[in-house]
Amino acid sequence: MDRCRIFRYIRAMKPRRLSFDLKLPAAYPAARVLGYLGRDPKSLTARVDGESFAIGLWIGGVPSLLRVDLAPKRAGATLEAGSRLPADAEDQARDQLGRLLGLNHDPAPFERQMLASPKLAPLIAGRRGWRILQTPDAFDGLTWAILGQQINLAFAFTLRRRLVERAGSPAPGGLFAPPRPAAVAELEVEELLTFQFSRRKAEYLIGVARRIVAGELDLDRLATAPAEEVEAALLAVRGLGPWSAHYVMMRAFGFEDCVPVGDSGLVRGLAKFFSLAERPDAAAQRELMRPFAPYRSWATFHLWQTLGDEA
């Protein structure tokens, strides 16, 4: 092979590893973000170590590992895969990292609105710059919403680990890329029952995965659709009620004005923030969240944070 052909061959090869930097805003709350990403110390998809974290992702069809060092004003990222990465791997990794770190929206308008109200300003005290942290992709957000229905966070973590172990894909570094719709669609309800899934939860999760595989629920299209259309599409899916729909809209699609009414963390956060003698019912939750519009997703994330590790 002559030198020109060798040069062309090398240029045509797709890398298995690449690095890039992502600019972070001033006073980015890195420690708080790392705390959120590391809530499950036994996670099979993410690991936090000091000021760094690693997470299993899908880049194209390739299970990959993204290692990220959070430094002042920058996130240094290294993407690694067991096979060759697609040509747009860096763009995909940047997009997913931006979602994970909450960089797709600016907190300033929400914070200005809070600071203008003496009653609401305490919500952001000590948490200026806090973000809406999204899931790496929309299906992961859907999975979290279904797993988290009517159970506490610790058990939701347990169910997700079992699901990842069964339907996720090994990535470098000993972590897994999360389950994709096709893998979940191949599961049977009876199998998930052995993992302590309720029958309904198993049916809902497998059912939504099969709808996605069949093209009946297009998550890519919903990513650019208006909020009303997204909510209607989600509510049409068996197993997704108003709480699940708003959770998915917030964490999977990044909508800024969602209220996951009935969420246990939201209920406890509202009771704590407003010093209520009793936990608010659904109507009271909507009324209490009204002053935070049109930034109720932001308020929800802050209310969760008031609970510390409980949320």
State the predicted function of each range.
Residues 4-311:
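HhH-family (HhH-GPD) DNA N-glycosylase catalytic core used in base-excision repair
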